[in-house]
């Protein structure tokens, strides 16, 4: 009885609550997930025999899609709850994966080696081969599951049709995974089709307009050709000097001596070939001996001059002494350039109102009382002009550049304190979008004088006004900036501007392009003195040829009694107006070096000497330089070069040191690139910020082809640098002297005299670059004059005088 009561008293097991049951299930699920994840990781990494075998077993099921399958399984294990909350996500993934299995198996049985194989047996044979050999080498399509799906689909729709079925499965799966409904998809497709239709219609209209432009251009060229033929026919007609009537060549009976010459090609005459003894000229024979002896054909104007006395004309006859090859030369028109696209800066206006408030609040937080007077929206930056209160020091505002950039969320802020000519301080903040300034837009808005051949539009200031500069007043220009900052585009814009104004007989170019790609497009234009120089060794000699030309011109000016090229050309015009013998004016010469750093590495002394001499004297001789470099360091832009090239154009650089090398002040390190520049001409103390014009390669090619179609290049052999070799004195590939340096004996004598040897001493005493000085030190060591380098200790001199 007692035992029965004890049995009754033993309480049954405590039933778990629902929360505890769920917790145990979650723990079991987590343990299983971790074990399964470890299994999958071993299989994915194929670790040992177990990993390879497990991987091949999964390949047996899903084939070569084993990796995506295992990765999706891992995501499912740890994101189960999240996936359950997404309606259709799991179903979409499964359906899309089945479509991929069909695609993979269709690709497998499209291979030639599987065409006559049974689908199940062929697939199993491939997988079993890898499974037994413990390797993974064969492409097995979608595995046995893929074979199971592919066989009925291929039977019903063929192998090609199975691709479409698999693709439909994938689309259906993606559709289930995304929150789109059928209406959204149809609406999206309809909008895309409408946009394509509109784009097609616009493209069709553009093609029609382009065809019409080509047709009109062809008609224009035909009319111009007809007019040229008419001018040529009229030029060949003979005028009777007594009656002034036009007569046929066969009926012409002119009795004076020069009548026969009227029907022949004009003869190339030197200045003094037919001067009479009693004629008084403005020049002596020796004075113009330097002038080009072969200057091309001239119009035969002697008949006109002879008939002047017979016709008793009191008024002087105006003569044209332009070479015949350039009489019909037409300057390029602005229509050759692509039209500029409209710019929308409405966002900037809204941003300016906000920034004005931010600026005033920021200054107020630092205890500085200022007021924003005005804001000017430029192409690349917006300039806020602020007026500080009385007693506020300017440097307090200048020191807040970084704080202002932080407050305005700007890339960088440049402070101009103060603005030249104003009692205001300028704060330049980059725009959210840079508005491109096209060359055509700048040319049309520029007020440059067309009579000034070297006055070219350069860019737009912050206030939107076009700015021009006259290279003749510069008189030389240094262009420097990092790679991709817009330096080469600016040089192309300057060249194109000059080509738009000047005939080949008015301006000549010498272009030096060691990079071989920037200026080569200008080859064969008649404005070139010689082809574009791409060899750095030849460039040094070419610059020396320009120096020789400068000296020759000064000798000519001295004999004539004029001070500059303008005075000389005026004398030529007066002489040609009063004499039958015609002389051609001297053209302006523009020397363009696109990469100065490369030249300084090859022949620094020769290049620097030539640049310095041209910088000191070439202005009056009508010779101007444009020097461009992407490495604005002091070993490239030396102090003497800076002193003789006073006008500077700085693009974006990496540091304030480079900015000071170019402009002698900071600022260029805060530029934005893409044509954003600081321009400091010779007549201004502070640089001006401009957005340079953009000229595309297509625009340059069009203007070059327009010029080439009119006339051919006529190079001047006097400027040809000739051939160079590795043994030329003063050159070497590493920037020093070649073997057998001509300064070796001088360096040896210097070392023996001072009993000291250092590269810096040779640099100072022999005026050579560092690379050449170190090369001389190596040669002195090889000759046994000095000992080897001993760290920081000076070298020992082994010989005595």
UniProtKB/Swiss-Prot annotation:
Localization per record: Cell membrane
SUPFAM superfamilies with a match to the protein in the record: P-loop containing nucleoside triphosphate hydrolases, Winged helix' DNA-binding domain
Which residue intervals are annotated with compositional bias (Acidic residues) in the record? 715-726
Give the record's keywords alphabetically.
ATP-binding, Cell cycle, Cell division, Cell membrane, Chromosome partition, DNA-binding, Membrane, Nucleotide-binding, Transmembrane, Transmembrane helix
Q: Recorded GO terms, molecular function?
A: ATP binding; ATP hydrolysis activity; DNA binding
> Which intervals lie on the Cytoplasmic side per UniProt?
178-801
Q: Where is this region: Disordered?
A: 715-739
Q: Does the keyword Membrane apply?
A: yes
Q: Which domain of life is it from?
A: Bacteria
Binding residues for ATP, per the UniProt record?
484-489
**What is the membrane topology noted in the UniProt record heading this document?**
Multi-pass membrane protein
For this protein, the parts annotated as crossing the membrane are: 31-53, 58-80, 89-111, 131-150, 155-177
Record keyword GTP-binding present: no
CC annotations in GO = plasma membrane
A single GO BP annotation from the record? chromosome segregation
- InterPro entries, sorted: AAA+_ATPase, FtsK/SpoIIIE/SftA, FtsK_alpha, FtsK_dom, Ftsk_gamma, P-loop_NTPase, WH-like_DNA-bd_sf, WH_DNA-bd_sf
**Domain FtsK residue range list:** 464-660
Q: What does this protein do?
A: Essential cell division protein that coordinates cell division and chromosome segregation. The N-terminus is involved in assembly of the cell-division machinery. The C-terminus functions as a DNA motor that moves dsDNA in an ATP-dependent manner towards the difSL recombination site, which is located within the replication terminus region. Required for activation of the XerS recombinase, allowing activation of chromosome unlinking by recombination.
Q: How does it assemble?
A: Homohexamer. Forms a ring that surrounds DNA.
The entry assigns this protein to a family as follows: Belongs to the FtsK/SpoIIIE/SftA family.
UniProt remark on domains: Consists of an N-terminal domain, which is sufficient for the localization to the septal ring and is required for cell division, followed by a linker domain, and a C-terminal domain, which forms the translocation motor involved in chromosome segregation. The C-terminal domain can be further subdivided into alpha, beta and gamma subdomains. The alpha and beta subdomains form the DNA pump, and the gamma subdomain is a regulatory subdomain.
Instruction: Return the protein name.
Output: DNA translocase FtsK
